[in-house]
Amino acid sequence: MIETRSDEQKYAFLRTEESREKNRYGDNIELAEEGNALREVSLNINGDTGISENPDRYKQHGFYLNADNCIGCHACEAACSEKNDNPAHISFRSVGYVEGGTYPDYQRLNISMACNHCDDPVCLKGCPTRAYTKFAEYGAVLQDPDICFGCGYCTWVCPYNAPQLDPVKGEVSKCNMCVDRLEVGLKPSCVSACLGNALDFGVIENVPENREQAQAEIPGFPTTDITHPNIRFQQTRQNKREMTRTDSMPLKYHKDEEVGKYKPVVDEKHGVKKQWNWKALLMTHESSHVIFTLSTQAILGAFLIIVLGSFTGVEAIVAIQSSVAYLPLLVLMNVLLMFGFYKLNMHLGKPHRFYRGFYNLRHSPVSREIAGVSLFFSSLLGFSVFSYFEIKPLIGLFAIMGVLSGPVGLFYMYKLYRIKARPFWDHWQTASSFVGTCLSLGSLTIVFVALIADALNTTQYISLVVLLLLGLLLEAIGHVAHAADLKNSEGEGSASWYLQTTRFAWPYIISNVLLGSSIIVSCLLLDSPSSTLGWLILGLSLLSTAVIRRSLFFALVIPTTMPGAFFWKNKAFEEHAKETGLANMPQVGVRYEEHRTFKVGELIDTIKTTTAKEAIDQLKEIFYWKKVK
């Protein structure tokens, strides 16, 4: 363990005092009772097998912020980054602020925030690689960047923006509670460095000396209902009724006089002018998700239509299966799904570690989605191969596998976006959009090949038109309901609606027009279902609205997160720095995302150095959901 300095100040040491049994959420503060197997186990920090004798070692600890004392000097940030050797663009602890009033009656409230080591860490449950662990020691939630493959899902689900995705290394890292310092009785580095005596640390719910409050909320802090964070606040000064953010997030905090708490509301700081912003919409990191979700849903829809249509004797499907178009259709489906997988994998920070996506089947919807869609892809591939050789028993086997695994993958694709920390996604419209896309793009895929091969007669197209129309109507109903709910909501959801009608207003309007046009053309095709021109218009309209709407799905989401500052943690400044070249200067704290490479050599080395026993033990941990010794 590290050695304490002989001149270490008294304020840098942890206090030992009586604590409560339960915290304010009803969770136990003592995380491992006497006799528990988790006790008296070394954390093996840097290979050190020592075990601390701290009597509070197995109690939940947390940070304490006295906002009255925080002067916004950023000493806590500097100390944290120095200790963890972080580059300028990564900071485990950040100081943001909200402000209210006007000069001379102006007020600024600084908020210093790192990981809150929550009682119910959603990052741990969401991470598909099991890179997160909540320890009985101090209740620390620790993350291993070496295990992380850089999907960034933990950064989506965390309400406090604690996990930091490094665009250079392609991995996530975060606050580790300075457990090496805790083991020798010292408080975390950020606390020891605080100039204003604003930060403190100790057993949760224990109020530090010379403090009056231990609140769980403060203006700008997201709701505690999601994760039960282990941080407490004091702020005795009276705030203004309205506190605003200086970053680009279109949010401010308005005090509800009835309950005495602040709630986020829309701040129309960017005006109400309708804008285009095509580049910001279509050329983003999330474009890979757009391609993957659309291609997967289209191919799943086409597969289910083929298999279930064949089973029920739908004339159009039977005709296609007996035509020359059938095998090319299956080849096209495999190619499109493979391309979607490729784009998804290459957006990872470490694409050669793709196999780690299966590690957290117990908790993570991402792992379950990957498992379901991967099994569906295998089923589609087997179905296609044995359809070529006309081996009916195996065709039937892979058809059943695909019909079962595909919807499971789609369900968890939907579940992984139902994130409480991202209200724009947390709506049933996400499901209606995904299912609607399956029906519409799935039908369109089949019709596209059938038209080229002239595989169907006029009346046989009608069943596919009906399915396509049902998909479009389902999407339209979902979008109308979603828009109505957003307009009537508060907070981040209504802020997303504000962006949808301002920054991305014209793409949103165009997508609505295209969706309506697609529905009208589909209705017209019921009268002339074999019209090549009609299908061409419908295809272009449908594909355009699908791409625009799915891109909006990712561009409009606003997470619940802590306020930033004018430069630091300000998305608008980050975009400006990248556009102007400021991001080339390391001291600016903004970096371009580096191109990802599939490091075949590292993957081969891993395969060579992993013994059969280690591989089997890893599989047991995945499927038996318990540690294998």
Positions of PLM-derived features:
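Hydrophobic, membrane-facing alpha-helical anchors
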Residues: 271-283, 328-329, 346-358, 408-418, ...
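Membrane-entry segments of alpha-helical transmembrane domains in multi-pass membrane proteins
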Residues: 56-68, 280-301, 318-342, 360-374, ...
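Juxtamembrane/interfacial segments flanking transmembrane helices
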Residues: 348-356, 417-421, 487-488, 554-561
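Non-ligating segments of multi-cofactor redox enzymes
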Residues: 1-294, 302-311, 316, 335, ...
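Long, contiguous internal "core" modules enriched in hydrophobic/ aromatic residues
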Residues: 286-287, 291-298, 314-321, 363-364, ...
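Primarily interfacial, aromatic-capped hydrophobic alpha-helices that serve as membrane anchors
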Residues: 517-524, 579-629
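Cytosolic/matrix-facing juxtamembrane and C-terminal tails of multi-pass cellular membrane proteins
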Residues: 484-504, 557-604
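Long, hydrophobic/aromatic-enriched structural stretches that serve as scaffold segments
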Residues: 29, 47, 310, 329-391
